[in-house]
């Protein structure tokens, strides 16, 4: 049941706007025959367990990834196209805006710091590629050499960047089934993230 919403001014009340909206949605949903679609099993299971959608029709249909485009390519060629170093291990981080707290950059920075501390040779043989807005704002906080790539809209460039990476890291605090994981895996790049 949705009530007493902490997002509302003064913390909400027992019969605040969130309660009224919840009750209205429940009435509309149950009387309309809507069939809901979730893009991941986790999101589908969460929706099925919610008090708003319990008992309603719901299917899971993952977002499509074109595996003719997002597929393994020659790493050396991909690195030439992406201008990333040919002779280093590459850890890839991707986010629309890398400074968004929920995307987990603070955890990524800490993890890279620990890796560099325990494996000092990484400073010579490993680099970070950061794809997304505000990437240049975090470079100085990373203990390994970093390449802020900014936004990339060109699909071929994006595929080259994924194929350049040795590992894709997604330390987000909340995601359902992000395309970045699917694209990375389709390119044959292992993904590491929180459960």
Residue ranges and their predicted role:
Residues 14-60, 65-69, 75:
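A short, active-site helix/loop in glycosyltransferases that binds the activated sugar's phosphate group
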Residues 74-90:
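Nucleotide-sugar donor-binding and catalytic loop/hinge architecture
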Residues 85-103, 109-113:
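Conserved donor-binding/catalytic core segment of Leloir-type glycosyltransferases
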Residues 166, 188:
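A short alpha->beta transition loop at the rim of the catalytic pocket in nucleotide-sugar-dependent
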């Amino acid at each position: 049941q949705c009530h007493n919403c902490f997002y509302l001014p003064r913390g909400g009340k027992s019969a605040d706007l969130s309660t009224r909206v919840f009750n209205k949605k429940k009435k509309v949903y149950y009387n309309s025959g809507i069939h809901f679609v979730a893009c991941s099993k986790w999101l589908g299971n969460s929706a099925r367990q919610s008090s708003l959608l319990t008992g309603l029709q719901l299917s899971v249909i993952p977002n499509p990834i074109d595996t003719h485009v997002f597929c393994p390519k020659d790493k050396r060629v991909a690195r030439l196209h992406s201008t990333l170093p040919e002779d280093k291990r590459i850890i890839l981080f991707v986010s629309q805006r890398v400074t968004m707290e929920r995307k987990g950059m603070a955890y990524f920075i800490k993890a890279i710091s620990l890796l560099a501390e325990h494996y000092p040779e990484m400073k010579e043989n490993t680099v970070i590629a950061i794809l997304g807005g505000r990437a240049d704002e975090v470079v100085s906080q990373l203990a390994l050499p970093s390449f802020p790539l900014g936004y990339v809209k060109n699909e071929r460039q994006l595929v080259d960047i994924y194929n350049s990476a040795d590992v894709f890291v997604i330390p987000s605090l909340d995601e359902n089934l992000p395309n970045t994981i699917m694209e990375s895996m389709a390119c044959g790049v292992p993904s590491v993230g929180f459960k």
